[in-house]
Amino acid sequence: PMFHCNGWCYPWTLAMLHARVICIRNIRAKEIFDLITEHKVTHFGGAPIILNMLVSAPKEEQKPLKHKVYVLTAAAPPPSIIFKKMKNLGFEVMHVYGLTETYGHILQCAWNKEWDDLNEDEKADISARQGVRYPNLEDVDVMDSETMKVVPRDGKTIGEIMIRGNVV
């Protein structure tokens, strides 16, 4: 979607790369599969609800992909089952995090080679996490908003995402 933070970044990058951009007015699974096949789409962005629509579409609407399609998804992390089902359809999904106030995505769950040996459920769970910062961001951490101390990286302690850089 080319609105809020995406509208400020992607169109310019895509134009710079001479990429073909396909915009659709009505979001329907059949149309998405048809366009991916017809135009050999390699990358697309969609919210978790779009990914859910694709994996839940009737089998006759789901076209087998002859090539890998890389997907960026943002908003709330998709359930791990969505990552597994998308992979089974031929999509490689990366969850990213960003804000309108940061000119787009600033964190990505970049795959780590040491995760290759995990089982499919563990891989899907890890894929929903946030990971490393994009190079355009100076610093990011999760902190206690009252003490301004970094919280433990234990997957349990709640904190606020603190962002610093010239894109904020």
Which sequence ranges carry the predicted segments?
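Adenylate-forming
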Residues: 2-3, 30, 34-38, 48-69, ...
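Conserved AMP-binding/adenylation subdomain of ANL enzymes
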Residues: 3-42, 57, 139
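Short, Asp-centered acidic motifs that coordinate Mg2+ and/or phosphate
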Residues: 42-43, 70
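Tryptophan-centric aromatic hotspots in well-structured domains and transmembrane helices
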Residues: 8, 12, 33, 45, ...
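Conserved AMP-binding/adenylate-forming
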Residues: 19, 37, 69-71, 78-96, ...
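Helix N-cap/beta->alpha junction signal
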Residues: 25, 47-48, 75, 165
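A generic secondary-structure micro-motif detector
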Residues: 1, 22, 71-73
